[in-house]
Amino acid sequence: FLFQPQRF
């Protein structure tokens, strides 16, 4: 997600 840089 947008708030998860590790997954994006």
Curated annotation (Swiss-Prot):
The modification Phenylalanine amide is found at F8. Disulfide bonds: none annotated. One of its GO terms (cellular component) is extracellular region. Keywords: Amidation, Neuropeptide, Secreted. It is found in: Secreted. One of its GO terms (biological process) is neuropeptide signaling pathway. Modulates the action of morphine. This is Morphine-modulating neuropeptide B.
